Amino acid sequence: MTNAVHSDALYQQQLHEKQQRLTQLLAPFQAPEPEVFASAPSHYRMRAEFRIWHEGVDELYYVMFNSETKQRYYVHEFPTGSQLINRLMPRLLELIRGNHTLKYKLFQIDFLTTLSGEALISLLYHKTLNEAWQPAATELRQALRAEFGEVDVVGRAHKQKIVLEREYVLEQLQVGDRTLEYMQVENSFTQPNAGMNQQMLGWATDVTADCQGDLLELYCGNGNFSLALAKNFNRVLATEIAKPSVHAAQHNIAVNKIDNVQILRMSAEEFTQAMNGEREFNRLKGIDLQSYQCNTILVDPPRAGLDPATVAMIQAYEQILYISCNPETLCDNLKTLCQTHNIARCALFDQFPFTHHMESGVWLVRK
């Protein structure tokens, strides 16, 4: 009990420090006090990647390496990982140890799990997977399913991928009073902290509740935000360049019975060219871009933030929802954006507790 209280106190302390840091960073832009969303202190990561270390004839271990010193660390448990990842880890190695086909040249194992209790395990090899691998992997999957329920296995090697049944999991997220189902595809980006993702989607839905017109989202992934926000807009136009993510987004639109979201497989630069009538694209046949009244834009850039051209482009919109995984590059972008827009609301999402990482959201409205 004492440890639990101590751990909670430490968690609240680090969360408060992040809140102070974000408040200081946003102060030059006259931002309101950030709304703060806490994470579960442990078992919050729904995905993990481990290198596999071979010792002797039969021994296998999960390891991680220090990125600077290259020192090797054995991983016997993973407290930040989901409960399901931690339950799967020892049993999976136990089953692989006794099978030469599965064990030989195995160098990495990736886990993808869901709040809904599903798991996808990717086995990565420094060898070509021969005809013996698939039956061995099928037997492995059957053993795991007997103990853990909905588990799928994928094998990958150089220019080779073997999918036994599914290369995805189906997640169910609670957003307000709605349950949304999301296909999450192996080796594609998904939000790692599912509990925090639910809170992010809830906040984004709340800040856009009174919006008029249509929404544009750049690089929508599997439709994570677009689907949750669709109810607040007449229509949603979303761009994405990765084929697996586009496929997942189309599935998610259909399974959630959402009829006002259009996914375009194109880059932000291509979309801007199409919207300005500078270039025609065959993939846009039958889609009248000029009929959209996109007053609101959603951007969720990588750590590098938005490039100057994209910053200039999004300034044309009445409202901007900016989800950031790096407050420094967010602030760099805000130096330009706040020339034309005010920060109406902002939030801190503690995506990765006990790290320096800060996820944040900023809702900008034209002056």
Swiss-Prot record:
Signal peptide: none annotated. Keywords: Methyltransferase, S-adenosyl-L-methionine, Transferase, tRNA processing. The active site is at 325 (nucleophile), 359 (proton acceptor). Transmembrane segments: none annotated. Coiled coil: none annotated. GO terms for biological process: tRNA methylation. GO terms for molecular function: rRNA binding; tRNA (uracil(54)-C5)-methyltransferase activity, S-adenosyl methionine-dependent; tRNA binding. It holds the Pfam family tRNA_U5-meth_tr. Its EC number is 2.1.1.-, 2.1.1.35. The keyword tRNA processing applies. One of its GO terms (cellular component) is cytosol. It catalyses: uridine(54) in tRNA + S-adenosyl-L-methionine = 5-methyluridine(54) in tRNA + S-adenosyl-L-homocysteine + H(+); uridine(341) in tmRNA + S-adenosyl-L-methionine = 5-methyluridine(341) in tmRNA + S-adenosyl-L-homocysteine + H(+). S-adenosyl-L-methionine binds at residues 191, 219, 224, 240, 300. CDD domains: AdoMet_MTases. NCBIfam families: trmA_only. Belongs to the class I-like SAM-binding methyltransferase superfamily. RNA M5U methyltransferase family. TrmA subfamily. Dual-specificity methyltransferase that catalyzes the formation of 5-methyluridine at position 54 (m5U54) in all tRNAs, and that of position 341 (m5U341) in tmRNA (transfer-mRNA). This is tRNA/tmRNA (uracil-C(5))-methyltransferase. The lineage of its organism: Bacteria, Pseudomonadati, Pseudomonadota, Gammaproteobacteria, Aeromonadales.
